[in-house]
């Protein structure tokens, strides 16, 4: 019996054994998009492992995801994201990335959990690119130049005189309001009247018209001139102002026939 068991044991030992199974590491087969999506996982540990796995990745698609993780509710994840951005700041493309993702950088400051030293690094990098600041404020429209102008004023990234020059000619109406507010508070009535009559922007004409009308600066000749504005809202305001002064429209049109006004 013992001899039979020994023979069976020898036979079993001669059967080829399968190779030990290698534990699959899920990160190996995941694309960058999938890994970036994992950074939004509900599991804080999963986010941590993903950040650790991506620590040497400098693909541009990852940058905004790291900005978002600066406010991660798990402290180690905030630290990992901050360390990654700190390393990235030594690379030549970092400045352009900060510019491209400025709105996300601004959003970081509005969150409860932040990493102040990295926020300062990001903002200082944007501030150093004065050509970008000036071009964006003067030539673009929408949320980006509006938010950027707030930061420029708050942190004095551009000298006030230069910013006034840029905002006066800015394409975005909200950015122009910085210049408008400044001149209505600081310039003379004569200067405001000059800007009113020479501005090519509807919002500037209307706002300055309203300011000067409320201050009782405009005479009937000024209002008549504005009545011929190419902007309907300004024309309508001027018509209202003339009616308030009991302007004799009949006599005016007798002296200035509509055909003559149209040709002019």
Predicted regions and their residues:
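Flexible inter-repeat linkers and adjacent short helices
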Residues: 1-140, 148
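Amphipathic alpha-helical scaffolding segments comprising HEAT/armadillo-like alpha-solenoid repeats
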Residues: 28-37, 59-71, 91-105, 127-136, ...
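Short inter-helical turns and helix N-cap capping residues of alpha-solenoid HEAT/ARM repeat scaffolds
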Residues: 42-43, 73-74, 140-142, 171-172, ...
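Structural detector for internal amphipathic alpha-helices that build alpha-solenoid repeat scaffolds
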Residues: 12-26, 48-57, 80-91, 112-124, ...
């Amino acid at each position: 019996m013992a001899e039979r068991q020994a023979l069976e044991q020898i036979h079993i030992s001669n059967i080829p054994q399968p190779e030990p199974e290698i534990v699959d590491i899920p990160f190996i087969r995941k694309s960058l998009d999938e890994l970036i999506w994992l950074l939004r996982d509900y599991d804080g540990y999963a986010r941590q492992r993903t950040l650790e796995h991506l620590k040497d990745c400098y693909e541009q698609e990852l940058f905004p995801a790291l900005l978002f993780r600066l406010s991660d509710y798990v402290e180690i994840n905030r630290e990992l994201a901050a360390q990654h951005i700190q390393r990235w700041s030594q690379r030549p493309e970092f400045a352009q990335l900060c510019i491209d993702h400025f709105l996300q950088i601004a959003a970081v400051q509005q969150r409860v959990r932040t990493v102040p030293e990295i926020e300062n690094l990001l903002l200082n990098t944007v501030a150093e690119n004065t050509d970008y600041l000036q071009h964006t404020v003067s030539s673009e429209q929408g949320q980006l130049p509006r938010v950027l102008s707030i930061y420029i004023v708050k942190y004095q990234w551009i000298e006030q005189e230069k910013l006034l020059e840029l905002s006066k000619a800015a394409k975005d109406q909200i950015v122009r309001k910085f210049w408008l507010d400044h001149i209505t508070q600081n310039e003379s009535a004569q200067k405001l009247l000059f800007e009113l009559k020479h501005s090519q922007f509807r919002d500037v004409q209307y706002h300055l018209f309203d300011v000067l009308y409320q201050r009782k600066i405009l005479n009937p000749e000024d209002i008549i001139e504005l009545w011929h504005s190419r902007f309907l809202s300004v024309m309508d305001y001027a018509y209202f102002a003339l009616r308030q002064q009991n302007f004799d429209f009949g006599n005016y049109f007798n002296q200035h026939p509509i055909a003559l006004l149209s040709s002019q």
